[in-house]
Amino acid sequence: MRAFFKGIRIFVAATAGLNGSSAIAADADQGATLAKRWCATCHVVDADQKQASADVPPFVAIARKPDFTPEKVAAFLIEPHPKMPNFPLSRTEAADIAAYIGTLRK
């Protein structure tokens, strides 16, 4: 949890000088492609996938959390964390995956 908040602080510091529209220009379609490549081994990332190999939340459950924001998820993906492999995602890729997860919030 400490790493999660550290990631949020890093994200806020990195984007503090940017206006809201340019802080994260995310591409949800690209995020879906990345999620299928990097995340689908452990997470259920879309409706076509019925099962994952780890006991982790599906992306729909992440999207529906009351405190979900794409910014929080993107920051979490950038910062190394012990519960998940540390994928070499760029800030743009993390934002794209977070934007895709946001599309699942219904």
Report each predicted region and the residues it spans.
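An amphipathic alpha-helix signature
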Residues: 70-78, 95-98
